[in-house]
Amino acid sequence: MCCVSWNWVLACTFLLIFLSWWNCCNDRISVNSGVPGMAARVAGAHHVVLTEQDELLRLLRVNLAANAEVLTHEIEEEKGGIVARPLSWGIEHTKEYLARYGDEKIDVILSCDCIYEPLYGTSWKGLAQTMELLCLANPKSVVLLAVERRNEDGIDKFLAFVEKETMLLYRRDEVTVGSSKNRLEVYHLHLENILKN
Protein backbone atom coordinates (compact mmCIF):
# COMPACT_ATOMS: atom_id res chain seq x y z
CA MET A 1 0.00 0.00 0.00
CA CYS A 2 1.27 3.47 -0.80
CA CYS A 3 1.78 5.34 2.42
CA VAL A 4 1.41 9.07 2.94
CA SER A 5 4.47 11.30 3.13
CA TRP A 6 5.69 11.20 6.67
CA ASN A 7 6.98 13.86 8.99
CA TRP A 8 10.74 14.53 8.88
CA VAL A 9 10.99 14.30 12.68
CA LEU A 10 9.59 10.80 12.41
CA ALA A 11 11.97 10.07 9.56
CA CYS A 12 15.02 11.12 11.55
CA THR A 13 13.93 9.25 14.68
CA PHE A 14 13.12 6.19 12.61
CA LEU A 15 16.44 6.27 10.78
CA LEU A 16 18.41 6.65 14.01
CA ILE A 17 16.72 3.55 15.40
CA PHE A 18 17.16 1.77 12.09
CA LEU A 19 20.87 2.59 12.01
CA SER A 20 21.35 1.07 15.45
CA TRP A 21 19.71 -2.13 14.14
CA TRP A 22 21.60 -1.96 10.87
CA ASN A 23 24.90 -2.11 12.76
CA CYS A 24 23.97 -5.52 14.20
CA CYS A 25 22.40 -7.26 11.21
CA ASN A 26 23.42 -8.50 7.78
CA ASP A 27 21.82 -5.60 5.89
CA ARG A 28 18.97 -7.48 4.20
CA ILE A 29 15.97 -5.25 4.42
CA SER A 30 12.38 -5.38 3.20
CA VAL A 31 10.48 -2.12 3.05
CA ASN A 32 6.90 -1.28 2.15
CA SER A 33 7.59 2.35 1.33
CA GLY A 34 10.15 3.86 -0.99
CA VAL A 35 11.61 6.74 1.01
CA PRO A 36 12.70 4.80 4.12
CA GLY A 37 14.16 2.03 1.98
CA MET A 38 16.08 4.47 -0.19
CA ALA A 39 17.34 6.20 2.97
CA ALA A 40 18.43 2.83 4.36
CA ARG A 41 20.32 2.12 1.14
CA VAL A 42 22.03 5.52 1.20
CA ALA A 43 22.94 4.87 4.85
CA GLY A 44 24.73 1.71 3.75
CA ALA A 45 22.27 -1.19 3.79
CA HIS A 46 23.61 -3.87 1.46
CA HIS A 47 20.40 -5.31 -0.01
CA VAL A 48 17.07 -3.46 0.12
CA VAL A 49 13.75 -4.69 -1.25
CA LEU A 50 11.01 -2.08 -1.65
CA THR A 51 7.51 -3.54 -1.84
CA GLU A 52 4.33 -1.99 -3.14
CA GLN A 53 0.99 -2.95 -4.65
CA ASP A 54 1.11 -3.81 -8.35
CA GLU A 55 -0.68 -0.63 -9.44
CA LEU A 56 1.88 1.59 -7.64
CA LEU A 57 5.01 -0.37 -8.49
CA ARG A 58 5.71 1.63 -11.65
CA LEU A 59 5.92 4.87 -9.66
CA LEU A 60 8.28 3.24 -7.17
CA ARG A 61 10.53 2.08 -10.02
CA VAL A 62 10.51 5.59 -11.53
CA ASN A 63 11.66 6.96 -8.15
CA LEU A 64 14.42 4.35 -7.97
CA ALA A 65 15.61 5.24 -11.46
CA ALA A 66 15.56 8.97 -10.65
CA ASN A 67 17.72 8.34 -7.57
CA ALA A 68 19.95 5.62 -9.03
CA GLU A 69 23.13 7.66 -8.70
CA VAL A 70 22.88 8.00 -4.90
CA LEU A 71 21.47 4.49 -4.42
CA THR A 72 24.34 2.68 -6.13
CA HIS A 73 27.42 1.96 -4.05
CA GLU A 74 30.76 2.04 -5.86
CA ILE A 75 31.64 -1.53 -4.93
CA GLU A 76 28.63 -3.82 -5.27
CA GLU A 77 28.93 -7.20 -3.64
CA GLU A 78 27.01 -10.21 -4.89
CA LYS A 79 23.22 -9.73 -4.62
CA GLY A 80 23.56 -6.23 -3.19
CA GLY A 81 21.52 -3.26 -4.30
CA ILE A 82 17.96 -2.04 -4.16
CA VAL A 83 14.96 -3.48 -6.02
CA ALA A 84 11.20 -2.91 -6.15
CA ARG A 85 8.79 -5.84 -6.01
CA PRO A 86 5.03 -6.31 -5.85
CA LEU A 87 3.53 -7.20 -2.46
CA SER A 88 0.02 -6.54 -1.26
CA TRP A 89 -0.74 -7.16 2.41
CA GLY A 90 -2.52 -10.24 3.70
CA ILE A 91 -1.97 -13.95 4.08
CA GLU A 92 -2.54 -15.03 0.47
CA HIS A 93 -0.42 -12.29 -1.12
CA THR A 94 2.41 -12.79 1.37
CA LYS A 95 2.46 -16.55 0.82
CA GLU A 96 2.72 -15.92 -2.93
CA TYR A 97 5.57 -13.48 -2.32
CA LEU A 98 7.41 -15.96 -0.08
CA ALA A 99 6.92 -18.76 -2.62
CA ARG A 100 8.71 -16.62 -5.16
CA TYR A 101 11.35 -14.89 -2.99
CA GLY A 102 11.53 -17.10 0.11
CA ASP A 103 15.22 -17.85 -0.39
CA GLU A 104 16.09 -14.22 0.29
CA LYS A 105 16.59 -13.65 3.98
CA ILE A 106 15.24 -10.53 5.69
CA ASP A 107 16.87 -8.98 8.75
CA VAL A 108 14.79 -5.81 9.14
CA ILE A 109 11.29 -4.92 7.91
CA LEU A 110 10.58 -1.18 7.82
CA SER A 111 7.02 0.14 7.89
CA CYS A 112 6.41 3.89 7.90
CA ASP A 113 3.06 5.61 8.44
CA CYS A 114 1.06 2.75 6.94
CA ILE A 115 -1.70 2.68 9.56
CA TYR A 116 -4.36 5.37 9.29
CA GLU A 117 -7.96 4.14 9.16
CA PRO A 118 -9.50 7.25 7.53
CA LEU A 119 -7.26 6.67 4.51
CA TYR A 120 -6.44 2.94 4.50
CA GLY A 121 -9.42 1.46 6.36
CA THR A 122 -8.66 -1.73 8.25
CA SER A 123 -5.87 -2.78 5.89
CA TRP A 124 -3.72 -2.85 9.05
CA LYS A 125 -5.03 -6.41 9.59
CA GLY A 126 -3.36 -7.52 6.37
CA LEU A 127 -0.26 -5.53 7.32
CA ALA A 128 -0.02 -7.40 10.64
CA GLN A 129 -0.49 -10.74 8.88
CA THR A 130 2.19 -9.87 6.34
CA MET A 131 4.62 -8.85 9.08
CA GLU A 132 3.98 -12.09 10.94
CA LEU A 133 4.47 -14.30 7.86
CA LEU A 134 7.67 -12.50 6.86
CA CYS A 135 9.00 -12.92 10.41
CA LEU A 136 7.99 -16.59 10.50
CA ALA A 137 9.92 -17.12 7.27
CA ASN A 138 12.85 -15.16 8.77
CA PRO A 139 12.69 -15.91 12.52
CA LYS A 140 15.51 -13.56 13.51
CA SER A 141 14.05 -10.60 11.64
CA VAL A 142 12.59 -7.56 13.36
CA VAL A 143 9.98 -5.04 12.29
CA LEU A 144 10.51 -1.33 12.85
CA LEU A 145 7.13 0.37 12.62
CA ALA A 146 6.89 4.17 12.54
CA VAL A 147 3.47 5.77 13.01
CA GLU A 148 1.95 9.21 13.39
CA ARG A 149 -0.83 9.42 15.99
CA ARG A 150 -3.97 11.13 14.71
CA ASN A 151 -7.66 10.99 15.61
CA GLU A 152 -9.16 7.56 14.98
CA ASP A 153 -5.93 6.35 13.38
CA GLY A 154 -6.46 2.64 14.11
CA ILE A 155 -3.00 2.16 15.63
CA ASP A 156 -4.35 0.87 18.95
CA LYS A 157 -6.55 -1.60 17.05
CA PHE A 158 -3.51 -2.73 15.06
CA LEU A 159 -1.47 -3.27 18.24
CA ALA A 160 -4.34 -5.17 19.90
CA PHE A 161 -4.65 -7.35 16.77
CA VAL A 162 -0.90 -8.02 16.77
CA GLU A 163 -1.05 -9.01 20.44
CA LYS A 164 -4.12 -11.27 20.15
CA GLU A 165 -3.99 -12.64 16.62
CA THR A 166 -0.29 -13.03 15.76
CA MET A 167 2.86 -14.54 17.22
CA LEU A 168 4.52 -11.12 17.25
CA LEU A 169 5.45 -9.12 20.33
CA TYR A 170 5.85 -5.37 20.26
CA ARG A 171 7.29 -2.57 22.30
CA ARG A 172 7.32 1.16 21.77
CA ASP A 173 10.91 2.36 21.40
CA GLU A 174 10.56 6.09 20.69
CA VAL A 175 8.03 8.88 21.08
CA THR A 176 8.40 12.43 19.84
CA VAL A 177 6.17 15.24 18.56
CA GLY A 178 6.02 16.12 14.88
CA SER A 179 5.60 19.46 13.14
CA SER A 180 1.81 19.07 13.13
CA LYS A 181 1.92 18.51 16.93
CA ASN A 182 0.94 14.87 16.49
CA ARG A 183 2.73 12.22 18.50
CA LEU A 184 5.21 10.20 16.43
CA GLU A 185 6.05 6.70 17.63
CA VAL A 186 8.43 3.93 16.62
CA TYR A 187 7.65 0.33 17.57
CA HIS A 188 9.84 -2.75 17.51
CA LEU A 189 8.08 -6.03 16.65
CA HIS A 190 9.53 -9.53 16.64
CA LEU A 191 8.54 -13.16 17.08
CA GLU A 192 7.90 -14.33 20.62
CA ASN A 193 10.99 -16.53 20.71
CA ILE A 194 13.46 -13.73 19.90
CA LEU A 195 15.31 -12.18 22.82
CA LYS A 196 14.20 -8.66 23.67
CA ASN A 197 16.83 -5.93 23.31
Swiss-Prot record:
Coiled coil stretches, renumbered: none
InterPro entries listed in its UniProt record: Methyltransf_16, SAM-dependent_MTases_sf
Keyword Disulfide bond attributed: no
Protein's gene: RXLR48
GO cellular component, one term: host cell nucleus
Function: Secreted effector that completely suppresses the host cell death induced by cell death-inducing proteins.
Family, per entry: Belongs to the RxLR effector family.
Protein name: Secreted RxLR effector protein 48
Predominant cellular place of this UniProt entry's protein: secreted
Signal peptide: 1-27
Keyword Signal: yes
UniProt motif RxLR-dEER: location: 58-79
Domain of life: Eukaryota
Domain statement: The RxLR-dEER motif acts to carry the protein into the host cell cytoplasm through binding to cell surface phosphatidylinositol-3-phosphate.
UniProt keyword annotations, A-Z: Host cytoplasm, Host nucleus, Secreted, Signal, Virulence
Subcellular location: Secreted; Host nucleus; Host cytoplasm
